[in-house]
């Protein structure tokens, strides 16, 4: 990695030139942790916060917000997104992008940031707002605890128990299973489930759940297979007819460096670069393609 002061200088030149794609390119070269160091070096060199300079130089919109997020404290960014999603009518899609698409380490820091910023404990605030009447709410509560426990049986045994839970609509078991099974153990169970039943877990989810319940369990399924798999699915959802810039800002700004494999996982839906080009305008599309490293 070049000296952070040199990278900060490159960014200053790109910002002065109002070159959004170049700012995105520089961001795409580094992890979130490295970008935070670059942002600190920028302040040391120029006496200004990097996101503030981006905001002054660019012309608003989700593009500006995304580029600012990339050089901001990502835990504070996630905390703010969650708070926004809880304000007024709950934004369920935002919960998938921020709560489920998140590593345990990042979640721990997000909880601390939320308390610091809003003087409230995140999980309590979340559950008070959404309630506990629906299964998706209870799964979210389990998910936010990040308490994974090894399953007692073999993958085949666990797959059989899971199938019984689907058949009996034992939602308490399903909530506990998806909320606590370790990711490393999930794939073998999923493979055994399909071999035994001739259908996938995602197909089984669709037999008993609809709407927000369905999407929450579906996202949990992909997250357990790998965050890049979930990112690919969420990006595909965001690539609707008009393109959902708010969702792409959340997904990309917080997780792009951890989910670059999404461009390969996306192949089951089509070509990520092509879909981004089709759904987003000539300002946003090049930024997204650059950050996700797709043509």
From Swiss-Prot:
Annexin repeats lie at residues 2-71, 73-143, 153-223, 226-293. InterPro entries: Alpha_giardin, Annexin_repeat, Annexin_sf. Pfam families: Annexin, ANXE1_4th. The keyword Repeat applies. Its main location: cytoplasm. It is found in: Cytoplasm, Cytoskeleton. Keywords: Annexin, Cytoplasm, Cytoskeleton, Microtubule, Repeat. GO terms for cellular component: cytoplasm; microtubule; plasma membrane. One of its GO terms (biological process) is cytoskeleton organization. One of its GO terms (molecular function) is calcium ion binding. The keyword Hydrolase does not apply. Giardins are involved in parasite attachment to the intestinal mucosa and in the cytoskeletal disassembly and reassembly that marks the transition from infectious trophozoite to transmissible cyst. They may interact with other cytoskeletal proteins such as microtubules in the microribbons or crossbridges, to maintain the integrity of the ventral disk. Belongs to the annexin family. Giardin subunit alpha subfamily. This is Giardin subunit alpha-1. It comes from Giardia intestinalis.
């Amino acid at each position: 990695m070049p000296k952070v002061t040199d990278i900060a200088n490159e960014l200053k030149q790109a910002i002065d030139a109002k070159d959004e794609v170049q700012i995105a390119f520089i961001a795409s070269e580094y992890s979130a942790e490295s970008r935070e160091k670059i942002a600190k070096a920028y302040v040391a060199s120029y006496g200004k916060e990097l996101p503030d300079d981006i905001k002054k130089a660019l012309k608003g919109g989700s593009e500006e917000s995304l580029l600012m997020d990339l050089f901001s404290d990502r835990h504070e960014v996630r905390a703010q997104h969650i708070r926004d999603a809880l304000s007024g009518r709950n934004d369920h899609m935002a919960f998938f992008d921020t709560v489920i698409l998140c590593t345990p380490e990042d979640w721990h820091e997000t909880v601390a940031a939320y308390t610091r910023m809003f003087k409230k404990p995140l999980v309590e605030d979340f559950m008070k707002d959404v309630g506990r009447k629906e299964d998706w709410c209870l799964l979210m509560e389990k998910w936010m605890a990040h308490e994974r426990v090894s399953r007692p049986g073999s993958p085949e045994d666990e797959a059989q128990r899971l199938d019984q839970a689907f058949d009996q609509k034992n939602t308490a078991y399903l909530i506990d299973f998806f909320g606590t099974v370790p990711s490393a153990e999930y794939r073998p169970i999923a493979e055994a489930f399909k071999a035994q039943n001739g259908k996938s877990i995602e197909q089984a989810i669709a037999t008993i759940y609809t709407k927000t319940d369905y999407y929450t369990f579906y996202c949990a399924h992909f997250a357990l297979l790998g965050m890049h798999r979930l990112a690919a699915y969420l990006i595909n959802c965001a690539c609707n007819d008009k393109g959902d810039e708010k969702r792409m800002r959340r997904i990309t700004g917080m997780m792009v460096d951890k989910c670059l494999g999404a461009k390969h996982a996306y192949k089951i839906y089509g070509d990520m670069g092509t879909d981004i080009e089709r759904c987003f305008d000539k300002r946003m599309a090049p930024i997204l393609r650059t950050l996700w490293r797709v043509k």
